[in-house]
């Protein structure tokens, strides 16, 4: 069951009901709270394009709590983040794993953040295939090409040498928010404000 909360807002024309994600979008907040597939990517890309049309000078915030997912779907989000004029700040809440970690690192430099108890996990692309040996070989080569492309982008975005990224993504590599900051995947850990 997928329950989406509704919020009621008072306006000069009366009450207005929004689903929570539409209300957050008014404040230029986009949520990635699931695996990354084509439908999720299309929704996020559309929201980014909409917000750019609304105000190309104002930042967009992308909150990430994702186990990762499809490389091609994630690259659609990544390319859009780099293409649009507004800076996209990224904030890890909970877990940013695999493609979720890649998108976290893709945020505007200086605007990549994580909450103190969140985690980041990087690893090499996963793939499963079946069929004729020749087709499996084609798919294996494609996964290796994608791994090299992702590692190159991660190296550029984190400031780490390509060789270290390749070594550190060979297996699942979990990091605390502070470790992700030291590694260069994010720029700051957001501390809970004191009252």
Curated annotation (Swiss-Prot):
Keywords for the protein's UniProt record, in alphabetical order: Cytoplasm, Hydrolase, Protease, Serine protease
EC number in record: 3.4.21.92
Record-annotated active site: 98, 123
**Record-level Gene Ontology MF annotations:** ATP-dependent peptidase activity; ATPase binding; serine-type endopeptidase activity
Keyword hit for Electron transport: no
Q: State the reactions this protein catalyses.
A: Hydrolysis of proteins to small peptides in the presence of ATP and magnesium. alpha-casein is the usual test substrate. In the absence of ATP, only oligopeptides shorter than five residues are hydrolyzed (such as succinyl-Leu-Tyr-|-NHMec, and Leu-Tyr-Leu-|-Tyr-Trp, in which cleavage of the -Tyr-|-Leu- and -Tyr-|-Trp bonds also occurs)
Q: Which NCBIfam families match?
A: clpP (TIGR00493), PRK00277.1 (NF001368), PRK12553.1 (NF009205)
Q: How does it assemble?
A: Fourteen ClpP subunits assemble into 2 heptameric rings which stack back to back to give a disk-like structure with a central cavity, resembling the structure of eukaryotic proteasomes.
Tell me the function of this protein: Cleaves peptides in various proteins in a process that requires ATP hydrolysis. Has a chymotrypsin-like activity. Plays a major role in the degradation of misfolded proteins. ClpXP2 is involved in the complete degradation of the Site-2 clipped anti-sigma-W factor RsiW. This results in the release of SigW and the transcription activation of the genes under the control of the sigma-W factor.
Please state what the protein is called: ATP-dependent Clp protease proteolytic subunit 2
The species is Shouchella clausii (strain KSM-K16) (Alkalihalobacillus clausii)
Q: What is the lineage of its organism?
A: Bacteria, Bacillati, Bacillota, Bacilli, Bacillales
Instruction: Tell me the name of the encoding gene.
Output: clpP2
């Amino acid at each position: 069951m997928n329950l989406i909360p509704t919020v009621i807002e008072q306006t000069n024309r009366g009450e207005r009901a929004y689903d929570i994600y539409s209300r957050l979008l008014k404040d230029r907040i986009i949520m990635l709270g699931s695996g990354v597939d084509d439908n999720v990517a299309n929704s996020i890309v559309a929201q980014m394009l909409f917000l750019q049309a609304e105000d190309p000078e104002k930042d967009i915030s992308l909150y990430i709590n994702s186990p990762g997912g499809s490389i091609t779907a994630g690259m659609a989000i990544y390319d859009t983040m780099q293409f649009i004029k507004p800076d996209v700040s990224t904030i890890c809440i909970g877990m940013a794993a695999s493609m979720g970690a890649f998108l976290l690192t893709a945020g505007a430099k200086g605007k990549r953040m994580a909450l103190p108890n969140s985690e980041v996990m990087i690893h090499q692309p996963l793939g499963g295939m079946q069929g004729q040996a020749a087709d499996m070989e084609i798919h294996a080569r494609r996964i290796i090409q994608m791994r090299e492309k992702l590692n190159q982008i991660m190296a550029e975005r984190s400031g780490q040498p390509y060789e270290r990224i390749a070594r550190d993504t060979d297996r699942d590599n979990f990091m605390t928010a502070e470790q992700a900051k030291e590694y260069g995947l994010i720029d700051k850990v957001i501390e809970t404000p004191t009252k």
